[in-house]
Amino acid sequence: MTKNNRTHRHGIYRLYAPIYDRFMAPSFADGHSKMYKPLNLKSGDHILEVGVGTGISLKNIPDFVKVDAIDYSEPMLVKARKRQENGDFAAKINFQQMDAHVLEFEDNRFDHSVVAHTLAVVAEPEVVLREIMRVTKQSGIIVIVNHYKDKKGILGTIWNPFRKRLGLGKHVDFKQIIENCGLELLAEERVNKITTHSKMLVCKIP
């Protein structure tokens, strides 16, 4: 894992790891079940998932693709690897602890990439998105799933500092960073409607 001087709130995920699957993951289940569908996966596709956590999303991936799944939190990855040992995944998964700001992959390695509930908790979301673009092939799809409102509002402004302290992330203008990065926004869909205000943003590398 590459070291750098960015501050990460990964320590709190050591506390969340034992309870994540039971108490937190269900609120994200709708988005997790949908986020691979826009990729229109083909046999042999190589996918990157950034911020894989305990691997709860990987049960939705077919067995004919290969996935590199990264997370900064080793306690979360321990849970994900345990799932793999138990045979929970059909696809071939390679788990790695890694800082998403400095992805340890060569350019144009992946056919498509997904990142769920991660860009709002990293120190520099635009840097991370640019790194994901770098390692994804031209014309590849990048799917972003995250808690998102176009406008933060008064309650959002009040709640934002507490979200950050709890490791739940900060308000990020995803459409703005998508535009800044030069991605083409193909589609957006509200997901996790009952429990959170989340959106799935489907982008294409031009």
Stretch-by-stretch model annotation:
Residues 45, 140:
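Glycine-centered, small-residue-biased loops immediately flanking beta-strands
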Residues 101-112:
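A short acidic, Gly/Pro-enriched loop at the edge of an enzyme's catalytic core
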Residues 112-124:
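A short SAM/SAH-binding and catalytic strip from SAM-dependent methyltransferases
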